[in-house]
């Protein structure tokens, strides 16, 4: 990207204190447990966080565009406005027990880039757009990366708008409720390059004493929701050999998920993240179990192999338990 102005590249620095203060101010919205955040997508807290981000961007001379999925695009004009922009961004929504930096750092660092180059009197040849993607986490409305998926042509708008949360509220209705649906058709935006600054979400950098790492590949992801149907029965009066215990089936499949991921190393991972048994009574054998499986690998062949093997093992487990 060509730069013009009074600063030279060797002297270009952001204001780290200002970025930190912005992160801490955003973290006041939707406080969570242990100093983290609960600012799930399309909640009132999400709307408040969006409004604060917009205010900061407009104070920095940026203009907002909003598409029909609620994706926010804050534009800093370049010297040649007809050139395709460079995008910087991530997401402001969090997990229910999320941290202060996951996603938020990628959005607010983009804002800090704009603030800093303005402070230094620098003009870029290309426009810069700081993006906030809606529902990247997917914790409230599955799947993750829903609105960016519509932008990329992976999902259509009807599919996204019909996604439901645990209370039966739809993505579309909640987006309208908080007032952050725009008019722009998703995906109708030229992008010269996209940069996302993100926390590691893992222990490797800290364990190796490193400050920063460069992403070398993305994780392929397979999500599955499983329902096992057994038979409710009294725990005290039903003989062991006559039980159809859906909870036991869930436990065995959970163990299989871990073992299969370990068999596909390096880089493959797997876990059961959500789990519920019904009727969820201490003296009733579960007649139904509902749980989610998360398999990931940068290698498509490994990802496919893990899924195929688990499906075969889960079928045998279900047969064995009746």
Language-model region placement:
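N-terminal capping segment at the start of a domain
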Residues: 3-43
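A generic, well-ordered mixed alpha/beta core segment in the N-terminal half of proteins
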Residues: 96-167
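Catalytic-core environment of secreted peptidases
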Residues: 60, 72-105, 234
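Beta-strand segments within the central parallel beta-sheet cores of soluble alpha/beta enzyme folds
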Residues: 67-69, 87, 123-134, 268-274
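Buried hydrophobic packing segments
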Residues: 53, 107-117, 250-253, 257
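Midchain, well-structured core segments that form catalytic/ion-binding scaffolds
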Residues: 135-136, 140-301
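Short amphipathic alpha-helices in soluble, non-transmembrane regions
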Residues: 305-315
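A non-catalytic alpha/beta surface segment that caps or lines the substrate-entry region
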Residues: 32-77
């Amino acid at each position: 990207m060509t730069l013009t102005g009074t600063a030279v590249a060797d002297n270009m620095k952001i204001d780290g204190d200002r970025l930190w203060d912005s992160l801490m101010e955003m973290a006041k919205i939707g406080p969570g447990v242990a100093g983290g955040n609960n600012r799930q997508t399309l909640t009132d807290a999400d709307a408040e966080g969006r409004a604060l981000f917009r205010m900061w961007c407009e104070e920095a001379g940026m203009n907002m565009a909003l598409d029909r999925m609620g994706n926010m695009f804050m534009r800093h004009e370049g010297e040649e406005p007809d050139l395709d922009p460079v995008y910087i961004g991530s997401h402001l929504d969090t997990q229910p027990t999320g941290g202060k930096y996951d996603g938020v750092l990628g959005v607010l660092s983009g804002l800090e880039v704009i603030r800093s180059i303005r402070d230094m009197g620098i003009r870029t040849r290309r426009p810069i757009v700081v993006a906030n993607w809606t529902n990247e986490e997917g914790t409230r409305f599955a799947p993750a990366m829903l609105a960016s998926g519509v932008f990329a042509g992976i999902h259509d708008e009807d599919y996204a708008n019909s996604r439901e949360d645990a209370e039966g509220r739809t993505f579309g209705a909640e987006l309208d409720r908080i007032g952050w649906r725009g008019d722009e058709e998703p995906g109708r935006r030229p992008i010269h390059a996209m940069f996302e600054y993100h926390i590691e979400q893992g222990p490797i950098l800290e364990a190796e004493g490193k400050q920063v790492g460069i992403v070398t590949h993305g994780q392929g992801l397979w999500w599955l929701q499983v329902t096992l149907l057994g038979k409710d029965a009294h725990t005290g009066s039903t003989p062991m050999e006559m039980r159809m215990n859906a909870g036991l089936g869930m436990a065995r499949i959970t163990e299989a998920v871990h073992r299969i991921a370990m068999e596909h190393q390096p880089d493959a991972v797997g876990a059961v993240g959500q789990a519920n048994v019904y009727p969820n009574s201490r003296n009733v054998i579960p007649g139904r179990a509902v749980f989610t499986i998360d398999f990931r690998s940068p290698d498509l062949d490994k990802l496919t192999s893990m899924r195929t093997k688990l499906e075969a093992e889960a079928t045998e487990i279900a047969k064995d338990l009746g």
